[in-house]
């Protein structure tokens, strides 16, 4: 917590519990000193430890190999999606992140995303905070799949199968 001490001391706590209390009686509650009076309950120790472990794991990876794997998955998915009738890839710059955005002509992106969800495939749908750009190009929304070092070609194949089924079912 950051602030001028005089202001922090004059502010009342907004939560109660744990180490933020100095003493409690039936007549009065006395709050601890700054910053402790704003730290209700037990700190989130388990998640801090988990974050440290995750950071250690990520630091142990060969980042170059991970990036190459991610880009390989993106290229594979792009190739397979481009082979499907009615699928149009959006954003095909040669150097980009391991993300594939696409539309299926005649289908609503949200409907496709919901169908893929029933298959256990997680995608994002919609404007992705780029509504003015999509409006400019007449795109009502896209389906976006992203790939990380832990994804596999088999998972991309499940995505492709799901998109194929969605086209057959929803068209």
Positions of predicted regions on the chain:
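Pyridoxal 5′-phosphate
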Residues: 1-171
